[in-house]
């Protein structure tokens, strides 16, 4: 796919622009991971290499690797000037100044619904700061993708996908407007009962649930940051459910975005 064709059609919620390697400043070029440069310059042959990296670094999401191997058109770069959680930062106050300008990795993939010329998935720079205390909980689900390849994996046009480490809130922060702290009952998915009432004493501790992935309509998936065993909680604020294999549930969400239902 031609660069100019992608640039004309490229859009995003992060005020992002599609960039060529030659468009980068000297500082941006120096800060870019070497593997990114290799993938960008490999053109339409990047799919196999990308899939191999995913299988190595994020082994619990094999269907994502399979999709990328078959449907990655090419890898590119984007200069993004607003993080995808700027609205949440405004709500919480202490994150309101989190705006950044950075070069991000862009996956240009086929739109299997044939609605748009392509879909764009964005991964931010690998996380190089001191890892948070709850990192092992996230790592048990998503492996080393965020620290070794790129941080986060978000569909460009929506807040959907794997969150970057700095953007992982607790569930109580994420649903600050949705969860009533004084309620005595919470309605969740429980087996075949769509909205089973769970008494307060059986609620999870929302302040200990760290959100690592998001979908549409306030759907979220979270690890219990006191555990590192690929378990967690997920779905919506009024349909929350315990999950025994969190990676599989997150992969289902990503595949819903990537692969049309037949």
Where are these regions (language model features)?
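A surface-exposed partner-binding patch
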Residues: 1-219
